[in-house]
Amino acid sequence: MVGSTRVRFGKAQAMKWDLLSRDRFDAVLFDLDGVLTATAKVHAACWKTMFDEYLRTRANKTGESFRPFDIQADYKAYVDGKLRYDGVRDFLKSRAIELPEGNPDDPPSAATVCGLGNRKNDMINEVLQSEGVEPYEGSVVLVRQLRRKGMKTAVVSSSHNCLAVLQAAKVADLFDVRVDGEVADRLHLRGKPAPDTFLAAAKQLGVPPQRAVVVEDAIAGVQAGRAGRFGLVVGVARKGEADALKDNGADVVVGDLSELVHEA
């Protein structure tokens, strides 16, 4: 922990609307999926579909037993919050499967790390186009309130679909800076749990990490916030993952960001 702004808050304090007070912080950096928009479950479902198709095909060829991708265990442990190709690598490593790296131009049919990642990307794009995106109401209210207080806001996401999701949810104009998978590739930034993308967003905003807040729902994300020595790391546990988020770097955990909204 660095600086006087980083504090461990108790449960009662964590629910106070002034947790994100203007005198303590200048900016709030939000993850996208599961924090701002209800797209985390869509990503998880697409990862499962893609990996299960690959694993089933592999099992048929090798004679190995087919063990499907588990959303509860595998998604949280190996994929959630990470850059797409990092997620592919980490999950395959957990199954002792080695594939060629390939390159980002690989077709979705290629049996490479990039090919599998591109296959998943095609799936999520199809879902976004057909079903649209809904933002979490409490999150939108909080972001608007923070901006009225003069605080800067950013989206920091591992997704290459970040801008499309923000536009579909009609919230793109609520953020001063966006650091996503596309930006990470261009700037050669390491993905979460490394703090690089959050640090890049804070730098673009002109705010030191100690004066910025990270808001995340993924284990890799809160780990990144802690590694970057940000002033406060807020975990969002919509499905009861509070203990895991606290154990991995969250200073406080809420079930929904509406808990941090000041009701005048």
Locations of the language-model features?
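N-terminal amphipathic/basic-hydrophobic helices that include classical n-h-c signal peptides
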Residues: 1-13
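Substrate-recognition "cap/lid" segment bordering the active-site pocket of phosphatases
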Residues: 9-10, 133, 151-152, 160-213, ...
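N-terminal helical cap/lid subdomain that shapes the substrate entry/recognition surface
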Residues: 17-32, 36-137, 148
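Short amphipathic alpha-helix with an adjacent loop that forms part of the alpha/beta core around
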Residues: 19-20, 259-264
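Conserved SAM-binding loop
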Residues: 36, 135, 155, 214-215, ...
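Short glycine-rich donor-binding/catalytic loop of glycosyltransferases
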Residues: 237-240, 257
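Short acidic-hydrophobic, aromatic-tinged amphipathic segments that line or gate anion-handling sites
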Residues: 252-256
